[in-house]
Amino acid sequence: MEKKRRARINVSLEQLKSLLEKHYSHQIRKRKLEKADILELSVKYMRSLQNSLQGLWPVPRGAEQPSGFRSCLPGVSQLLRRGDEVGSGLRCPLVPESAAGSTMDSAGLGQEAPALFRPCTPAVWAPAPAAGGPRSPPPLLLLPESLPGSSASVPPPQPASSRCAESPGLGLRVWRPWGSPGDDLN
């Protein structure tokens, strides 16, 4: 039994030695390596490999990043629902299925994005009512279904460039939680 164990150890050490000769040829060929030398060079090589991989491809510990993302979704969804109760009219809920970690950019190229991940219907910010003091409510968000003369069906998604270009120059006041230039926060 002991002979088999020693034979396995020696075979593994010879394999390590032949692998290390390729990487440390200048150190190995000059002298005969002892078992301790082979093990030391193996540890040195594994540490250098580990350090080089950490710099190239940082991996979060465990699954902290995806689980953190999933834990944020319910809170944001609840915040959006509270916005409905206040009367902001925001009806663009987050999709709970997205907690699985899938995003639009993770889909293969050339494939249609699933209906769950299509952008929400474009909305229009209504101007704020006459200033009622520093704590006046934010302007209301009006979706096409709540605008007069609009149908209740959702229009097809538009490219991001056309959606983003709708708001500039309309003269509408957009509420920002951090405030905007000219707001009196006193």
Curated annotation (Swiss-Prot):
Looking up SMART domains in the UniProt record yields:
HLH
* Molecular functions (GO terms): DNA-binding transcription factor activity, RNA polymerase II-specific; protein dimerization activity; RNA polymerase II cis-regulatory region sequence-specific DNA binding
Q: Name one GO biological process term.
A: regulation of neurogenesis
Keyword DNA-binding listed? The answer is yes
Q: Where is the bHLH domain?
A: 1-49
Q: Where is the composition biased (Low complexity)?
A: 142-153
Q: Report domain Orange positions.
A: 65-99
Q: Magnesium among the record's keywords?
A: no
Location of motif WRPW motif in this chain is 175-178
Record's superkingdom? Eukaryota
Q: Note down the stretches annotated as region Disordered.
A: 128-186
Q: Which CDD domains match?
A: bHLH-O_HES3 (cd18933)
Its keywords, alphabetically, are: DNA-binding, Nucleus, Repressor, Transcription, Transcription regulation
Main localization of the protein?
nucleus
- Give compartment(s): Nucleus
Q: Give a Pfam family name.
A: HLH
The cellular component terms of Gene Ontology attached to this UniProt record, alphabetical and capped at eight, are: chromatin; nucleus
Subunit comment for this entry?
A: Transcription repression requires formation of a complex with a corepressor protein of the Groucho/TLE family.
Q: What does this protein do?
A: Transcriptional repressor of genes that require a bHLH protein for their transcription.
The UniProt comment on domains reads: Has a particular type of basic domain (presence of a helix-interrupting proline) that binds to the N-box (CACNAG), rather than the canonical E-box (CANNTG).
UniProt-recorded name of the protein: Transcription factor HES-3
Tell me which species this is from. Answer: Homo sapiens (Human)
